[in-house]
């Protein structure tokens, strides 16, 4: 089955895109919100692996670590959508003048900063699991 044509769909449909269509969106030569969304989705995927690794581990605190990873996964998913919306606002502000565009750019910088923070927290949990997690799945963390 063919996917829908490629275009600025991520800002509109975000995480509801098929993986195939999402990857086409990333590669498309269109002005879409992809950089932040890619980082956020990658972070959400990493947090999912951390959660899985923690659930398969038996050390004290593994359950709490899995819950923390789930919160990070949820946050990263939301940030993917927020980043797309912020970029769409920048595109819309281009028609409104310099002041509106500056304000939109300032707001558009917020989701990537939050994505970076979420990724750093996820990496911290992964590092802990790489040391303390179940040996068979440490590499997945």
Task: Locate each region found by the language model.
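Amphipathic alpha-helical interface segments
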Residues: 83-141
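Conserved phosphate/anionic-ligand binding catalytic regions in large, soluble enzymes, centered on
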Residues: 28-51, 137-141
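Amphipathic alpha-helix face/heptad-repeat signature
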Residues: 38-45, 65, 72-79, 108-122
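Transmembrane signal-anchor/signal-peptide helices with a preference for the extracytoplasmic
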Residues: 52-60
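Short, hydrophobic/aliphatic alpha-helical segments
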Residues: 14-32
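Amphipathic, well-ordered alpha-helical segments in soluble domains
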Residues: 18, 22, 45-52, 79-82, ...
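Polytopic transmembrane helical bundles with strong interfacial aromatic enrichment
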Residues: 2-17, 41, 118-122
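A structural-propensity feature for long, helix-poor, extended segments
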Residues: 59-96
